[in-house]
Structure formats: structure tokens, C-alpha cells
């Protein structure tokens, strides 16, 4: 399959590129050429996506079977690119988000849950949900019968740059006593970035279209499963000290916010980790074991170091007060 990946250097895009190469696909990428050297075996096309004329020049003379787009900012950029790719590509896969569903999310929500409003021509990226919905509409405008909208849940695995698992692995690897947001039996729902990439590529090959909630099956793992497995992966002598949400809130320690288990005001959102993914599973979505996801993330971190921080996804280090955490640990040990 001749594939164009828009981006291709970070997190989801990088996983898509590497998975496609492993499959034997003919892979091109389009990006600014600033973040990382091109992956060996890739044909790099250089352009700033916010400059439609530069994108047009980069695309000129090329055609692809499929395009994968991970853009998360102003929808107008998606619309400009989709317009330029119309007639050059047979399939457009857009990595969207469950965030396009209107808040609050109902328990067990599927693809039919109400959606936020979005404008495909908007230049505003301050509202993530509206931007992603606008991106969806932009793709549908130019690929009405050939658009795959992957509404992803929490994406974990190697190359993660949004301050979840890398932060927890580093935190646990230091040893000692570490606060964890109780209860340990809280369910979590996530997808390994490589499983998402594999599904996107297989779906592109089949010409699958439509909107799909793409995350792991509900009820498969808990927060306790994740953190205890992370401890085992790091091999460190660390003690998890579980603190109830009310206690964390009282001490201004918003642990759990990184997993969407609580909001900045301390409230616990509904519907975050129990989405109905039966449609994607029926279309071939598969998920790997939790231990594999965590172990491979730890190997990547040790090999490449921590990813550069993102302004739109600050590390928990920026909002978790270490002194307040120690005070609560001292309180719980009395």
C-alpha cells in the first residue's frame, strides 16, 4: 500500500510509520522536517502544514492509496490538506478523539452519543473537542465516502508525550513510598499506540469508512493493575500508598487527573473508561497485554530518554506539589 502519513515523527504518527514499514508499505511523510530525522525507508516530503501553497508543492506529482492524519489543532489546516489530497488519495484516516462527544459522556457511550459542534474552517485550536470535531468535518467534506474517523480514547505505549505512563514509570523507578489515587479497582480504558496504528492501516487497506470509538475493551484492567504492573516492569522497590480522592482533594493533590479520573475541580467525570467499542472490535481492532505496553514503554524511555514536554499537555510535575505529597505520606504513616 502506498501510504502518506501527515506528521509521522511523534507518538501516533511515529507508530503508524514504523508499523507501516514493518508491513512492507511504501511510506511517505509530510512534515516540517524539524523534529526528528526521517525514519530509514521513508520518503520525506517537507512542508509546513499551515502553509497550503507549500503543501501543494510538496504533494505535486504524487498519489497514494491512503493517508493517515493525526493533526490536533486548527481544523482549517485539515480542510486545506484534505482539499489538496482530494483526487490524490483513495482513503483518508483521521485520528480523532472520544473528546468529540458532548460532555458529560453517558456510561457505555458508543459512536451514536451526541457530538460537540465543530467548524471545518476554524483557525481556533483552544477548544480541543471542537477542533477535533472540526477536523472530522473537514475530512468528510472532501472524502465523504472514504473517510475513517478513529475516535481514540487514552493512547499509551512507546513515544507517548502527554505525561501519563512515562511520568509514572519515572516516578516509580525512584523507589520509596509513592502516592497513588485510590481506589485501586478503578477501571481504566486505553489503547496501545501500535494497536491503533495496526488497525488504522488494516482498515485503510480494506477501505473501511465511518466513525469508530477506538480504545480497549471496557473492564479489562484497573488502575491497580496498571500501577502494580508498572512497578514490576521497572523492577524497583517502591511502595504504592493509596489515598482516597477526598484526601487528595483536601491536600490539593490532583493525582488521577492524568488518566481522566478526575477534573481540575476534583470532581470525578462519568463515562471516561467504559466506552462501547464493539463496532471497532467487529472491524478487527485487537489489543495487546498491558505488560507488553508498559515494558516496551520503559525500554523506549531508557533508550531515548524523556520526550520533550508539550505546551498543551504539561507533565504532572508541573501541577503536583512534591512537598504536599510528602506531607500527606507522612500523615498516612502515622
Identify the function of each model-found stretch:
Residues 30-35, 48-49:
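N-terminal Rossmann-fold cofactor-binding loop
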Residues 107-137, 162-166, 189-190, 220:
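Short-chain dehydrogenase/reductase
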Residues 3-23:
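N-terminal Rossmann NAD(P)H-binding glycine-rich loop of SDR-like oxidoreductase domains
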Residues 41-52, 71-72:
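Rossmann-fold cofactor-recognition segment
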